[in-house]
Amino acid sequence: MPTINQLIAKGREVRAKRNKVPALQGCPQKRGVCTRVYTTTPKKPNSALRKVAKVRLTNGYEVVSYIPGEGHNLQEHSVVLIRGGRVKDLPGVRYHILRGVLDTQGIAKRRQRRSLYGAKRPK
């Protein structure tokens, strides 16, 4: 426990907040090119084949991004837009790919939460 005089002399050190999405550099989204599109398995106790892509961003960072929704049209050299947001059961996946933007198609049959998946309003 510091004395009053020690606090006056030095003060308290404020802990720096860790950035959860460093590759975005404070931007809401970033554009990048897929270098590899593959599936990976989640941590225990879950079981699935999660679709992910390794993306090289315009600022030079290379990150692993999750491809949300059922089915996708991404392949190597596809241009995508990524946003922040991790996938809890995939270690190292801290970004999401935006659907319905650039080379990523939206989901055609989607009826609910359409804006998240780039789906047009059904007639």
Curated annotation (Swiss-Prot):
GO molecular function list: rRNA binding; structural constituent of ribosome; tRNA binding
InterPro entries with a match to the protein in the record: NA-bd_OB-fold, Ribosomal_uS12, Ribosomal_uS12_bac
Entry keywords, A to Z: Methylation, Ribonucleoprotein, Ribosomal protein, RNA-binding, rRNA-binding, tRNA-binding
PROSITE patterns: RIBOSOMAL_S12
Pfam families linked to this entry: Ribosom_S12_S23
3-methylthioaspartic acid carried by residues: 89
Domain of life: Bacteria
GO CC, alphabetical: small ribosomal subunit
Residue spans crossing the bilayer: none
NCBIfam families named among the record's database cross-references: rpsL_bact
Subunit field text: Part of the 30S ribosomal subunit. Contacts proteins S8 and S17. May interact with IF1 in the 30S initiation complex.
PANTHER family, alphabetized: 30S RIBOSOMAL PROTEIN S12 FAMILY MEMBER
Protein name: Small ribosomal subunit protein uS12
